[in-house]
């Protein structure tokens, strides 16, 4: 396993993060494709065997049962607390990112994970209903209380992250050290502003959906899997751009064939070639962990990276929330992204 540092926090993380959205109690109308406690334990055990020490989840994943399954698995495997970097998120709950909600939700998360502190606490989205100062101060209080080691953010506009960092700096509060953004070969909009802002603040990039919800894992668009047929969020995120994205999928398949590896390994290797610290991979089987880890040994040439990126076209923004009552910001019309 290869390791790096979580931004300016000094926390050592594996170059792969195990995502917890695949874990938890399946529920109709939400995540019907998640796996149970026994399967969760098997996936986590395999990840740990490979040296993956970074696990991400959220209070909203499967209504908290993702956190429960992860906590149960780590206890049953007798994993020392200092050997894992646990991250969870807050926002999709009553009260959003208000001080009261943050204070309440961290206690629930810690209880479900079976720990007395989090290594990384991430705000899942930007909260328009709560003053930024209130949110940042509440998060800083958790750090000072020893309940959280570092802070992260996810899926927002770059100007919002910049404002949050400015508030933290001006008040001497804890700054954010990581950004969990939507980033893959089919969606590269954050190269325009978010990623440069993160580099300015010495933040780690830990993208979600590095495999575009499976679209970068197979040469065809459709999937007969439970997730492929029930996940409306995935459909809304990618299907509207199928026409412009499918040629990129075909190029991933071509590069994978030339290397004799699964397409997923090419898609992941591209992230590291781009300087990304730790893409988050969701795995429903131990073998999927094996495939992801093998991608660390795949090196793409500059010519291959250019080949994979050449056909990218601008996309509507996916992830950040627009201000309530206002039309969401559109994507850019600048076609060419350069390395």
Residue map of PLM features:
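Conserved, mostly hydrophobic/aromatic
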Residues: 6, 18, 40, 55, ...
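N-terminal binding-site loop/beta-alpha segment at the start of enzyme catalytic domains
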Residues: 1-84, 144, 335, 339
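Aromatic-lined glycan-binding groove of carbohydrate-active enzymes
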Residues: 190-227, 262
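Generic structural signal for well-ordered alpha-helices
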Residues: 44, 67, 71-74, 106-110, ...
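Terminal-tail/helix-coil boundary detector
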Residues: 1-2, 200, 224-254, 258, ...
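Glycine/proline-rich, positively charged
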Residues: 27, 93-193, 200, 204
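Active-site-proximal loop/turn and secondary-structure-junction residues that shape catalytic pockets
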Residues: 22, 59-61, 90-94, 124-127, ...
């Amino acid at each position: 396993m290869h390791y790096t540092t979580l931004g300016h926090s000094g926390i050592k993380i594996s170059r792969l993060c195990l995502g917890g959205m695949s874990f938890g109690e399946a529920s109709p109308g939400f995540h019907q494709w998640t796996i149970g406690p026994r399967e969760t334990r098997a996936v986590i055990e395999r990840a740990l065997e490979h040296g993956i020490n970074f696990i991400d989840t959220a209070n909203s994943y499967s209504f908290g049962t993702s956190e429960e399954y992860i906590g149960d698995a780590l206890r049953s495997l007798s994993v020392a607390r200092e050997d894992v970097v646990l991250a969870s998120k807050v926002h999709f709950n009553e009260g959003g990112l208000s001080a009261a909600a943050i204070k309440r939700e961290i206690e629930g998360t810690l209880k479900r994970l079976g720990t007395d502190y989090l290594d990384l606490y991430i705000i899942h989205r930007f909260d328009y209903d709560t003053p930024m100062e209130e949110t940042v101060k509440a998060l800083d209080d958790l750090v000072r209380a020893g309940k959280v080691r570092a802070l992260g953010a996810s899926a927002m506009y770059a100007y919002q992250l910049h404002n949050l960092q400015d508030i933290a700096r001006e008040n001497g509060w804890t700054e954010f050290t990581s950004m969990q953004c939507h980033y893959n070969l089919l969606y590269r909009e954050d190269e325009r502003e978010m990623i440069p802002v993160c580099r300015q603040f010495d933040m780690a990039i830990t993208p979600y959906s590095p495999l575009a919800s499976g679209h970068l894992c197979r040469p065809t668009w459709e999937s007969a899997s439970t997730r492929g047929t029930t996940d409306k969020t995935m459909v809304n995120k990618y299907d509207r751009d199928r026409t412009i994205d499918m040629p990129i999928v075909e190029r991933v398949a071509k590069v994978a064939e030339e290397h004799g590896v699964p397409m997923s390994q090419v898609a992941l290797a591209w992230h590291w070639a781009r300087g990304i610290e730790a893409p988050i991979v969701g795995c429903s089987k131990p073998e999927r962990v094996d495939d992801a880890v093998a991608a660390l040994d795949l090196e793409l040439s500059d010519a291959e990276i250019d080949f994979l990126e050449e056909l990218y076209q601008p996309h509507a923004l996916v992830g950040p929330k627009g201000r309530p009552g206002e039309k969401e910001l559109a994507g850019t019309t600048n076609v060419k992204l350069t390395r």
